[in-house]
């Protein structure tokens, strides 16, 4: 069983279910899969980032394999996604919110666990981001999509912000659920505001064809 403090464990399990449901719904949207494929991809989304984190901080076996609640909630999210997949178009807003919830909670938990393992500030922030985006990256790769974290839109940046707030509050001696929720809220708000206003991370300038190529219409 997990040895996390109860408030952080509750946050971690919430993110696990949210990412399991979101990951499975995203998989249904991207590829035609049977129930096994949907559940497996939901579990990969929910557990993949945490497994990568635990391997990197040498916390083995990973927490996802030691506590039945993690894989049970991830699988439950996948099964629920399969059950409601016929209403996928109407669920688009829910998919977006669930993704932001999972991203936020995992960024906070990942950074917190990295600090507990003795990592310095910058590595802890990076592990927070890896925890948040790792599972979704594996899922997207398996269904043949460019991973969400590599496409336009704010994704890794909100996770980094949430991890940074977690590190800052911990380093100043502020712990517990209020601090974790505050850090998660920062990540969630940046992600949702970025989507609402269409804010993207900086992109390289477009390359223009040499010679007499036609100009793109704006």
UniProtKB/Swiss-Prot annotation:
In terms of domain of life, where is this protein from?
Answer: Bacteria
Q: Which InterPro entries match?
A: Gly_transporter
Mode of membrane association: Multi-pass membrane protein
One GO location term (cellular component): plasma membrane
UniProt keyword Membrane, yes or no: yes
Provide the transmembrane region boundaries.
Answer: 8-28, 37-57, 64-84, 91-111, 118-138, 154-174, 179-199
Q: Where in the cell is it found?
A: Cell membrane
UniProt feature coiled coil, ranges: none
Please list which residues make up the signal peptide.
none
Q: Which family does it belong to?
A: Belongs to the UPF0126 family.
Question: Per its record, how is this protein called by name?
Answer: UPF0126 membrane protein SCO4104
């Amino acid at each position: 069983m997990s040895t996390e403090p109860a408030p952080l464990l509750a946050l971690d399990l919430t993110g696990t279910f949210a990412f399991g449901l979101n990951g499975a719904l995203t998989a249904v949207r991207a590829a035609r899969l049977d129930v096994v494929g949907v559940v497996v991809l939901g579990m990969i989304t929910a557990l993949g980032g945490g497994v990568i984190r635990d391997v990197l901080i040498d916390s083995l076996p990973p927490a996802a394999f030691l506590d039945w609640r993690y894989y049970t909630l991830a699988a439950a999210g996948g099964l629920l996604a399969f059950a409601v997949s016929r209403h996928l178009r109407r669920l688009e807003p829910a998919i977006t919110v669930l993704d932001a919830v999972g991203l936020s909670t995992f960024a906070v938990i990942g950074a917190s666990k990295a600090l507990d393992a003795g990592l310095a500030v910058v590595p802890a922030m990076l592990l927070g981001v890896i925890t948040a985006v790792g599972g979704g990256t594996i899922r997207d790769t398996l269904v043949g999509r460019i991973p969400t974290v590599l496409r336009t839109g704010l994704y890794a940046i909100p996770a980094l912000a949430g991890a940074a707030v977690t590190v800052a509050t911990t380093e100043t001696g502020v712990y517990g659920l209020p601090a974790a929720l505050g850090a998660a809220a920062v990540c969630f708000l940046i992600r949702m505001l970025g989507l609402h206003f269409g804010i993207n991370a900086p992109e390289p300038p477009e390359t223009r064809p040499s010679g007499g190529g036609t100009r793109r219409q704006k």
